[in-house]
Amino acid sequence: MKRAPVRPRSREALLLFFPNPMKPYFLFLAAAALTLSGARAQEGAVTFEAKAGPGKGKHVVFLGGDEEYRGEECLPVLAKILSDKHGFKTSVCFATGKDGTVDPNVNTTLSGSAALDSADAIVILLRWRQWEDVAMARFDKAFKAGKPVIALRTSTHAFKFPDSSPWKSYNKFGKNVVGEDWVSHWGNHKVEATRGVIEPAHATHPVLRGVTDVFGDTDVYEAYPPADAAILLRGQVLKGMAPSDPPAVYSKKRATDQVEQDVNTPMMPVAWVRDFKQESGVTNKVFTTTMGSATDFASEDLRRLVVNGVYWSLGMDVPAKADVGTSGTFTPSKYGFDGAKKGLKPADFAPGTGK
């Protein structure tokens, strides 16, 4: 029996599969760009596969969702440092809108939350989130399993669920676990920057290895960590927004007890570590810094402090001076509400994509 010749598909038939004939080409280019940047997008998270390094076999998951401090920009940078320079697999999850673009003003979503199922440590830059049950259940499971928590800036007030929510106990996650809740802007917001000053009593703590010069253009938060916390850095309030500015000199009242003190005597803590013991007996290692805008992470030693915090939280030897070089030029956006870049997908924030 003679086989009928195969007729070439008509243009109309091809258009059923590819309405835009160039679309496969552009999809290929997009995939190639992600591969070249060392990232891949999977189920809404951006994942950086591990290169050689001591972190090989460990997965660090970054959770972003703050309206002001451009966590969507700095978390991928930190994640790529850990994967490229230290051998950790890292994933970054974002707050996204209905169209899948990154939108930190949406406080109910966490793209790629499945990454939490294999997390060995969790880095958070969150502010008053009310995640959906699926994402919250994954976070709850990882936290209750004792996964370490590295908390940045507004993560002192990470969650804000209504009283009717089964997750409302997480509204105290800042005070109970991170080590402080939201209290106040101790320095004048957007007017007085922060210089990190090492706490002499813990100057030899491994998280401070190689850390000598921390500066951030965010202000100092008022904070009173619990007695079991080891304070690593205090925040000197500066007179202006430049690293060369002198310390501020004036008095103000503390929000907690209305007692007046010099703004820098004593200085407020801006970084600490602690062990949080759950009622189940499980213990989480916790590293917290109330610094942490994208612009703050222009400071090499602040990046090093956080990388060291990841090592310490996982019980690993902290390098003498961790490599925290960024991929290409890191030009973070200035912090502020409604300042997030519009129309970008999670993969667009991977360093090296040029977005």
Segments predicted by a language model, with ranges:
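An acidic, glycine-rich "communication" segment
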Residues: 56-57, 152-251, 322-355
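Bacterial N-terminal signal peptides that target proteins for export
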Residues: 8-28
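Short alpha-beta junction capping motif
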Residues: 59-65, 115-164, 289
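Glycine- and acidic-residue-enriched helix-capping/strand-helix junction motifs
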Residues: 65-80
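Extracellular ligand-binding/catalytic regions of CAZymes and related secreted enzymes
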Residues: 42-55, 74, 84-85, 241, ...
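Bacterial N-terminal signal peptides
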Residues: 27-37
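Glycine-rich, highly charged phosphate/nucleotide-binding loops
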Residues: 99-114
